[in-house]
């Protein structure tokens, strides 16, 4: 899980979602998980 000031999709399967007021990227590839913070 990366914590970045700006989250971007890395591949086609990445999805940007909002959860509990935080922007997240979820993906099949665990290396692509990100949260904005």
Swiss-Prot record:
Please give the superkingdom of this protein's source: Bacteria
- One Gene Ontology cellular component: cytoplasm
Q: Does the keyword Transcription regulation apply?
A: no
Show the GO MF annotations.
structural constituent of ribosome
| Pfam families recorded | Ribosomal_L36
Q: Which InterPro entries match?
A: Ribosomal_bL36, Ribosomal_bL36_sp
UniProt keyword list: Ribonucleoprotein, Ribosomal protein
A Gene Ontology biological process annotation? translation
Annotated NCBIfam families: rpmJ_bact
Similarity section: Belongs to the bacterial ribosomal protein bL36 family.
Q: What is this protein called?
A: Large ribosomal subunit protein bL36A
- Organism equals Clavibacter sepedonicus
Gene of this entry = rpmJ1
